[in-house]
From Swiss-Prot:
Superkingdom in the source lineage: Bacteria
Protein family (similarity comment): Belongs to the chlamydial CPn_0128/CT_035/TC_0305 family.
Pfam families: BPL_N
Protein name per Swiss-Prot or TrEMBL: Uncharacterized protein CT_035
């Protein structure tokens, strides 16, 4: 039986990890797939994990610890896994981690620029794409980001907390733009996908895994975001169903937007 692996090592946010695992368990049930948390040692050293894995998810948190743990053999195995037919979903920090390079404006005001191994998106990820008060230790930067999707009409809101846009995504013919930020200048790419040999990669700046009904945080900005997402999520929910079907069955189908 195939499995879904969720990375849960240093740098992963416990809060977003819980949302990711809960969402995946909900949507994976019809596919009869087990959702398993794994650490970096597993991805680096476990023999043949690729053969039993349908989807690898790198959730939200902080990219630098991901790189410190997985750089080298870990990212080489992930890249090979995808090229041989596996699927990769990177959310927020997991999306930064999946890009060739990125720029991130730290809460201190300094600009962090880095290159990464995987390069699933061959360009640069830039963030946080909203100039909110992002913090590694609080929810001060949380907001509801309005998205428009390539294949689903209407506007939906998704949770945002420090995520990226994918710079000049339309200039890369191998990249499909799945969703755009609807209230930012130029409507930059918020979610992108790519066919890589036999595999499929999806990178999302916003937290599409977030389940508002399971959020109990009481900060005013979080409450406002939660209410917006709960009230305006029909296109997002349709997209997520479509997305999980593609990832768990590795279907070759999509259009450019």
């Amino acid at each position: 039986m195939k499995r879904i692996l969720v990375y849960s090592d240093r740098g992963v946010s416990p809060y977003y990890l819980r949302h990711t695992v809960r969402w995946l368990k909900q949507v994976a049930a019809p596919f009869q797939m087990e959702v398993c948390r794994v650490n970096g040692r597993f991805l680096i050293h476990e023999p043949l994990w690729e053969e039993t894995t349908q989807l690898l998810v790198i959730p939200g948190g902080a990219d630098v610890p991901y790189h410190n743990v997985l750089h080298g053999l870990g990212t080489a195995r992930i890249d090979n896994y995808v090229r041989e037919g596996g699927c990769y979903l990177g959310i927020c920090a997991g999306a930064y981690f999946g890009c060739a390079q990125f720029e991130f404006l730290e809460p201190t005001g300094s600009l962090f620029v880095a290159k990464r191994d995987l390069g699933f998106f061959p360009g640069a990820a830039n963030g946080p794409v909203y100039e909110s008060a992002f913090s590694y230790t609080s929810s001060s930067g949380v907001l509801a980001a309005p998205l428009v999707f390539a294949d689903f009409p209407g506007e939906s809101f998704s949770l945002f907390n420090g995520g990226c846009c994918f710079e000049n995504a339309e200039h890369f013919p191998e990249i499909c733009i799945e969703a755009r930020y609807n209230n930012l200048l130029g409507k930059p790419a918020a979610i992108v996908s790519r066919r890589l040999d036999k595999g499929l990669v999806v990178l999302s700046g916003p937290h599409i895994e977030y389940l508002p009904e399971f959020c109990s945080l009481q900060e005013d900005n979080v409450i406002q975001a939660r209410e917006q997402i709960a009230a305006h999520s029909s296109s997002l929910e349709e997209y997520k169903q479509f997305l999980i079907h593609r990832l768990l069955s590795n279907v070759v189908e999509h259009v450019l937007y």
